Amino acid sequence: DCQERDPALSELFIVEGDSAGGSAKQGRNRKNQAVLPLRGKILNVERARFDRMLSSDQVGTLITALGTGIGRDEYNPDKLRYHKIIIMTDADVDGAHIRTLLLTFFYRQMPQLIERGFVYIAQPPLYKIKRKKQERYIDNDRHLSRVLIELGIEDVRMLNLDGSPALEDGKMAEVLKILEEVEHVAEAMARKSVDFDEYVKRYDPAANRLPLYRVRVIPPGGDVENQEIHLAFTDEEMRKIREDAEARMGPLDPSQFKWDELHLAPGLVKQFAQLQALGFGIPALLRNGAPIYEADVDGKKVPLFALGDLLDLVREVGRRGLSIQRYKGLGEMNPEQLWETTLEPTKRKLLQVQLDDAVRADQTFTVLMGDEVEPRRAFIEENALNVRNLDV
């Protein structure tokens, strides 16, 4: 616990595991920061009866720490002992699961704490980079990409194949920023099993548009591994895809024909226009067998087979002389590092949980932990490719 008794000045960190809990206890400000480590697996609140949930050691300790009581007769949010409840979990799948579970618990049992803005999620850094004696903490993969570009951009020149400059002075940073956004879209498409090159090839220059729908045709028997992925501009095109599939497979039930919108399409069209304004055609995004540009790195020529190669090269140059440490868990940080990055109020980053965040967590948890098999199977099918950086 902490020494402060004024809830408005007190913070409770709910920390995953003993190792991170130990570092947090040593690194915190004992005056107003309390730490509650969650040990072992938290109770599955979806399937457990209410009385059984209350008897869980983990949930019981949490309720005691909060001071609000629980249940119709005892719960009183005005008795909350901390006006900042900060969920601090690892940046991996287990951490996401625990965070989802805790948000579900607060949403179902103590919604007023979320409504009053008392629940937060800590944003610890994912990386620490070091060059010579300089150290820097990095929030996430996109932040790392930006930093590597900053470090590498001055040492790379982009050339046409005849050796002339392919970019005006000062335009490299602009191009790389656009290419980062395109890369982000390509990764999102890959998670939806959409081949990015094939998607770009469907660009309609006359109408300045890209396909808006992804259509999945699943063979009989639910054979998801052999599903067909189609792209469509219109409802009429989707209807034609269904007709063609039914001509081959017979009538399709709703579980065999699914579609969703590709919300990133309008943004990608805008990025195409930005690249064209800088003198790059859309085909330059597509890899082929021959170089289309080259880069000069310290006098050495490097072939570029697509614009994305330029982005990769600049980041590779930015890595030179750099030590990059990825934190698989909060327990890998010593108390001083945890204080500096995640506990210290003037430097840390917190996300305040909004009610719609908790609603989404509740819905996700209901799907994953409930007794309904079909929604869970559909969720896993849709999201299996979304999991990155698995620590196994």
Across the structure, where does each feature detected by a protein language model lie?
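Conserved phosphate-chemistry cores used by DNA topoisomerases
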Residues: 1-392
